[in-house]
Regions:
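Cellulosome-associated attachment modules in secreted, modular CAZymes
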Residues: 1-158
């Protein structure tokens, strides 16, 4: 659980939107009254009304943000133009320390390309980050034919 405090915001009804570095954002379906008293919004609870269809990955009573938006264009794309997969590969191939231009090269740092959040950016091999992207695209409820070129768009912005 994390708390956010808005000291200067006037009491009113606001949409609450949550975003994390390489995830599609999620927002409340309706404005939430924010004022002097604490207001609790639990985006991890699948019964919390959110804006849009399939705005989050749902597993029983829990929900999570869709991960894989490396280039932060509000879409998960594994194949084709502006693909997040290509963004991961380009980051690794262009790294100054990757002298052999290996797709198995690893970068250890906090980065939007670290989709599995293990602190390592990896394109190919065990525990790679591209599997997270492909998994979220192939298993997305709207991708009824499990196409790898399916695009998952951020519901909060539609």
């Amino acid at each position: 659980q994390s708390s956010l405090i808005f000291n200067a915001a006037p009491a009113a009804a606001y949409y609450v939107r949550l975003w994390h570095r390489n995830h599609l954002s999620i927002r409340t379906a309706k404005p939430i009254n924010l004022g002097v008293d604490a207001t609790f919004v639990d985006f991890s609870n699948s019964s919390t009304p959110t804006y849009g269809t399939h705005a989050a990955y749902v597993e029983g009573t829990l929900q999570a943000l869709w991960a894989g938006d490396v280039n932060q264009d509000a879409a998960l794309i594994a194949e084709g133009n502006n693909s997040d997969r290509t963004s991961i590969l380009a980051l690794l191939l262009m790294d100054a320390n990757n002298e052999s231009a290996s797709s198995n090269f690893q970068i250890q740092r906090y980065d939007a390309a670290d989709l599995n959040l293990d602190g390592i950016v990896l394109y190919a091999g065990p525990n790679n980050d591209t599997n997270v992207l492909f998994g979220n695209i192939l298993l997305h409820p709207a991708n009824v034919y499990a196409n790898s070129n399916f695009i998952v768009r951020e519901a909060a912005l539609q």
